[in-house]
């Protein structure tokens, strides 16, 4: 909303990372560390309540949540204890703005400073004690006072005003900024940064009369927007705000004196600084650290335990079904959602990316995806960064991007335990440089991101748990045709072939994998991308296949490895399976083949198109291997040499779904979660057009442009607290 002179958010994303929720006894990987005396909430409570908050906000604001991720992790290596006791909760999203409004205007003396939204309360005044200091360092009162919150219904009203102004022929907004960290002092100062401004504190809305001047200036009640408006347009903006039931306050103006001040009614200025003091060049900070080599034991395994390994991997929260998340959030509001999480006739959350259309009838859209690899980053921070970018891109590749990789922009959010132990600052530098170098080689930009560099939880007994250094990469790009997005659901057609396409150009490695995690290991040998140019070529070759409609189904290889990818392609169906032969893969270690998380994808191609597909891949110099074909049998047969293994799809799907059930039963009532677990596979969705359907408006006498009145009148009521009115009106 705060981009340029105003923009339109369309859909949201969310990521949750915690320590193990321990929803069921008997999971050996959850027994490596003892249960701690959690400072505020248990991991299980955080997973449920945090996702409730994201879901509730999206439902109230009218913004669908269409893409997300979950990771749980704990580990002990010698005396080092790792885990997301200090949790990560990331919310993001996609939207767009007009070219006219993409850049902020230049403020001039006399522009009015406007705040739209709710009142000031004692919210978020604990400073950086949540994001910039180890949790547990300060008293619980200070830490809890740092918690922010936002009123979705109020923010929707503020958004309606911004949207209305952006849709006018002449946008009166000079500049706009959201209220986040540091409240008014941050938001309003950035509006007037180029010329200075004076804020009348008596005009700021006060919801709590006991607030001090500092609390009024710096609280983080986040359902507000700050705008710089041309003076002659103030009354017009006020009328728009009144129509939208959005509280609007003219709280100051730009001055031209290059000072930024808050002034009370009695003339006292509790805050008065030169703009240069706030935004001038900061003194250089020198951080001295040294590289510390840490080694992580590799997992030991036996092929004879393959089925046990697989059932364990499928139960990890990062791999398992996310139905407990998707069944409680709106994934379709706006009427512009072209791809959300749930796929196939069983509508299971399997999508690699989320896609929105820009309007109700056009083909253009926006795709978004996520990537992270913190386990790998423990052993090799550079590889962890590369894998995070790679996962985001192999998730995004299924949408036909308007200009291939040139359409893609990334956001990198860094959560790192700096100063928690020697060598972490150096590891962060290595990780950031690796991500920068990889993206430069791919010729994609990373224009935005955030950081939290104190990812350590300290306990009263003196113990501490270090969160793994983590970068979460969000990818977005313009889509040329939302109808061409490839689904991960296998098409039950024996006249098709399944291929593996390698993006890593690296040997198969188990370090940093979900497989290693279930064995309580991390492993020193982690995969990476050995050739960024090759990765780019592979991405663009697959994009060509997508644009030409040559891929029937496709899925990325990430958490859980190749075997999880193959199973997930079958989970959303009620019939059919695969017969897979791995002899053409050079690696002889079956466990590595099935569970390594080297970047790559699996595609299904019609036999009549396979020569064209091969030609495109070979022309691009991209490696591929034929894996097998779909079958009528409800299992996946995997053979390597003389050995053959059978995996029952329906059984493995229940194993995969069980973790969702265990979390769902904690958030639902009256045994609903159990009923859903017992019946989710019994209700395949079928949709068929009438035999005479031609797919044309004219068949039903409908003019999509509404040039001829129908004579029927309908009223759409739009009031505060409502959403979805535009799609209903259309």
Map each language-model feature to its residues:
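Glycine/proline-enriched, intrinsically flexible loops and inter-domain linkers
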Residues: 1-730
């Amino acid at each position: 909303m705060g981009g340029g002179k105003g923009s339109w958010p369309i859909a949201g994303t969310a990521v949750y990372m915690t320590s193990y929720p321990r929803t069921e006894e008997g999971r050996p990987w959850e027994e490596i560390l003892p249960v701690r005396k959690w400072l505020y909430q248990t991991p299980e409570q955080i997973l449920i309540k945090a996702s409730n908050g994201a879901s509730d906000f999206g439902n109230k604001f009218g913004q669908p949540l269409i893409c997300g991720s979950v990771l749980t992790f704990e580990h002990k290596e010698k005396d080092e204890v790792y885990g997301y006791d200090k949790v990560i909760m990331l919310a993001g999203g996609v939207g767009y703005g007009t070219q006219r409004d993409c850049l902020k205007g230049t403020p001039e003396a006399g522009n009015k400073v406007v705040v739209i939204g709710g009142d000031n309360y004692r919210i978020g005044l604990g400073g950086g004690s949540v994001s910039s200091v180890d949790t547990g360092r300060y008293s619980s009162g200070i830490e809890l006072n740092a918690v922010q919150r936002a009123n979705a219904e109020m923010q929707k009203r503020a958004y309606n005003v911004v949207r209305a102004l952006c849709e006018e022929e002449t946008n009166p907004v000079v500049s706009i900024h959201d209220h986040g960290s540091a409240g008014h002092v941050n938001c309003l100062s950035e509006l007037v940064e180029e010329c200075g401004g004076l804020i009348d504190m008596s005009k700021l809305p006060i919801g709590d009369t006991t607030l001090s001047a500092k609390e009024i200036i710096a609280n983080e009640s986040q359902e507000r927007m700050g705008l710089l408006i041309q003076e002659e347009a103030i009354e017009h903006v006020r009328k728009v705000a009144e129509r939208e039931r959005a509280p609007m306050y003219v709280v100051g103006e730009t001055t031209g004196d290059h000072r930024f001040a808050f002034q009370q009614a009695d003339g006292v200025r509790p805050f008065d600084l030169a703009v240069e003091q706030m935004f001038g060049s900061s003194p250089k900070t020198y951080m001295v650290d040294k590289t510390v080599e840490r080694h992580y034991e590799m997992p030991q395994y036996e092929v004879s335990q393959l089925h046990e390994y697989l059932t364990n991997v499928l139960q990890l929260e990062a791999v398992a079904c996310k139905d407990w998340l998707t069944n409680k959030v709106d994934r379709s509001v706006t009427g512009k959602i072209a791809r959300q999480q749930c796929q196939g006739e069983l509508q299971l959350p399997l999508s690699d990316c989320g896609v929105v259309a820009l309007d109700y009838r056009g083909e253009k859209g926006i795709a978004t995806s996520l990537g992270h690899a913190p386990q790998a980053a423990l052993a090799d921070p550079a590889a962890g960064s590369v894998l995070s970018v790679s996962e985001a891109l192999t998730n995004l590749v299924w949408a036909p991007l308007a200009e291939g990789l040139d359409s893609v922009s990334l956001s990198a959010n860094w959560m790192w335990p700096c100063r928690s132990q020697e060598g972490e600052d150096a590891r962060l530098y290595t990780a950031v440089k690796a991500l920068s170098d990889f993206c430069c080689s791919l010729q994609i930009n990373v224009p935005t991101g955030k950081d939290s560099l104190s990812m350590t939880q300290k306990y009263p007994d003196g113990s501490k748990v270090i969160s793994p250094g983590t970068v979460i990469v969000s990818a977005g790009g313009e889509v040329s045709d939302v109808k061409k997005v490839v689904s991960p659901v296998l098409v039950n057609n024996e006249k098709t072939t399944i291929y593996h396409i390698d993006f890593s150009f690296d040997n198969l490695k188990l370090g940093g994998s979900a497989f290693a995690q279930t064995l309580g290991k991390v492993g020193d040998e982690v995969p990476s991308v050995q050739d960024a140019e090759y990765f780019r070529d592979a991405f663009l070759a697959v994009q060509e296949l997508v644009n030409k409609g040559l891929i029937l189904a496709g899925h990325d290889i990430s958490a859980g490895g190749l075997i999880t990818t193959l199973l997930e392609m079958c989970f959303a169906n009620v019939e059919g399976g695969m017969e897979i032969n791995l002899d053409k893969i050079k690696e002889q270690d079956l466990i590595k083949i099935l569970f390594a998380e080297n970047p790559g994808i699996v595609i299904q191609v019609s036999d009549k198109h396979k020569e064209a597909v091969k030609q495109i891949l070979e022309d691009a110099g991209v490696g591929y291997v034929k894996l097998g074909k779909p079958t009528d049998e409800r299992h996946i047969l995997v053979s390597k040499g003389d050995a053959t293994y059978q995996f029952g799809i329906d059984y493995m799907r229940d194993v995969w779904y069980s973790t969702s059930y265990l979390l769902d039963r904690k958030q639902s009532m009256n045994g609903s979660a159990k009923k859903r677990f017992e019946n989710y596979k019994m209700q395949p969705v079928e949709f068929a057009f009438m035999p005479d359907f031609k797919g044309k408006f004219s068949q039903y006498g409908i003019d999509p442009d509404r040039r001829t009145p129908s004579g029927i009148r309908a009223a759409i009521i739009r009031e505060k607290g409502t959403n979805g009115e535009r799609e209903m009106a259309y």
